[in-house]
Regions:
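Beta1/beta-strand and adjacent pyrophosphate-binding region of the FAD-binding site
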Residues: 2-16
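Conserved mid-domain beta->alpha element of the FAD-binding
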Residues: 12-22, 26-28, 34, 115, ...
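Residues in the short beta-alpha loop(s) of Rossmann-like NAD(P)-binding domains
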Residues: 37
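Active-site-adjacent segment of FAD-dependent monooxygenases/related oxidoreductases
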Residues: 45, 50-118, 344
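Conserved FAD-binding catalytic core of PHBH/FMO-like flavoproteins
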Residues: 117, 140-144, 152-154, 160-271
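A conserved short coil-to-beta-strand element within the FAD-binding core of flavoproteins
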Residues: 129-143
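C-terminal helical "tail/cap" subdomain of flavin- and related membrane-associated enzymes
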Residues: 277, 315-407
Length: 407
């Protein structure tokens, strides 16, 4: 065991960092969370929690409170602009595999607030807001984290550091861990509107993907509104894409002119597919967006990050508590990086290509695949296992670097 002052420091108080903190505290391990902002983020960002993620949050005691603040989506639907609905899939078909057979639509800030409320006052938990990681150095038994707060630098020492500090991770950069991948040329425009798509499109699911060779779109229902996502061509400037004229023209592609279509909020963002070359370097780990980012089609980014966090803490906790050998930590990189590359990156890229396909053969293949899954219960179940991220979790659990020995 290290002589470091703290067992674990976590950089970042987003959903990934806070889930990691909660599970370590559950294992009676003291944790310090460093958050560069002055408070928890109130941005919506990710808003989908998949069935196995809800099961994990239930094990930590947070699921019921989160579910009460969100909207259950029992089905997911795939359509095409040419052929209409291709297939609707009910998560009830995998109710024997999960305790929560639905997607939950709830903004990620709701989870971080729930966790902070639960951990506040616990002597094992501390959080420092307005504290930005400036640099990280490590030896064979200690990690030194230099933090800037109120214009002053402070050095913290710990045995283990978890970098959950987002896509621009200072932890990752300080350890010279490459962030390999690419940025899509187009951006994604998200428009939030109170338009009732259930009335406009009877039978529409709360999660609905619509393939269109000209301009695909994605409908996501949240409490009191819908989010509509569409791509924005590379040649369109950010200023134009956020203009009232452009946003209005975009929403009018799917909402008739005779209906009011007020826009409550718009967001335009660049979309990346990147994965860190390593998820572990010595005593430093990466999780969530610090380790991998992807397009949001499929809702796999935050969920994958939470899966990272709990995979890691399930290993790190026993190591710190002396019931497991440090050798088990090597499995974290193998398990989570492998499924990130094969499943999360692969599936999100495939989702985008299916929706935007212009070649008739590619579009026909997508239509045929969805229709086949809708017509065959076993194929439908396989689709649900994949999109709910059950397959990636199972795949990760089967990977091991070597035999491990008790500590």
């Amino acid at each position: 065991m290290s002589n470091a002052k703290l067992p674990v420091i976590i950089a970042g108080a987003g959903p990934v960092g806070m889930v990691a903190a909660a599970d370590l505290v559950r294992q009676n391990i003291p944790v310090l969370v460093l958050e560069k902002n002055d408070a928890l983020s109130s941005e919506s960002r990710a808003s989908t929690f998949h069935p196995p993620t809800l099961d994990m949050l239930d094990d930590l005691g947070f699921a019921n409170t989160l579910i009460a603040q969100g909207l259950k989506a029992p089905t997911v639907q795939y359509s095409s602009s040419e052929d209409g609905v291709l297939g609707t899939f009910d998560f009830a078909a995998i109710s024997d595999l999960v305790r929560h057979p639905f997607r939950l639509q709830a903004e990620q800030f709701k989870l971080t607030r729930i966790i902070l409320d639960a951990l506040s006052g616990n002597p094992l938990f501390s959080i420092a807001f307005g504290s930005e990681v400036k640099s990280v150095e490590q030896t064979s038994d200690t990690v030194k984290v230099v933090v800037t707060a109120n214009g002053h630098d402070t050095t913290h020492e710990c045995a283990w550091l978890i970098g959950a500090d987002g896509a621009n991770s200072i932890v990752r950069r300080s350890q010279d861990m490459e962030f390999e991948g690419f940025t899509w040329p187009e951006r994604f425009l998200v428009m939030t509107t109170p338009v009732d798509f259930t009335a406009l499109r009877p039978g529409v699911s709360s999660v609905s993907y619509v393939a269109d060779p000209e301009r695909w779109y994605f409908l996501l229902r949240i409490l009191g509104a819908w989010r509509v996502m569409m791509p924005v061509a590379a040649e369109t400037s950010d200023e134009e894409a956020l203009s009232e004229a452009y946003v209005t023209a975009s929403i009018r592609r799917i909402v008739p002119a005779e209906l009011d279509a007020p826009i409550l909020h718009t967001t335009l963002y660049r979309v990346h597919q990147r994965v860190a070359a390593n998820f572990q370097k010595g005593r430093t780990f990466l999780a969530g967006d610090a380790a991998h980012i992807n397009n949001p089609l499929g809702g796999m980014g935050m969920n994958g990050g939470i899966h990272d966090a709990l995979n890691l803490t399930a290993k790190l906790g026993p190591v710190i508590n002396g019931t497991a050998d440090e050798s088990i930590l090597a499995d974290y990189d193998l398990q989570r990086r492998t499924v990130t590359m094969q499943a999360i990156q692969g599936d999100t890229i495939r989702n985008k290509k299916n929706l935007e396909a212009k070649d008739e053969a590619d579009r026909a293949r997508f239509r045929d695949d969805i229709r086949a899954a809708a017509a065959d219960s076993e194929k439908g179940r396989q689709l649900l296992r994949r999109i709910a991220m059950l397959d990636s979790l199972e795949r990760a659990g089967a990977l091991h670097v070597a035999e491990h020995h008790p500590g």
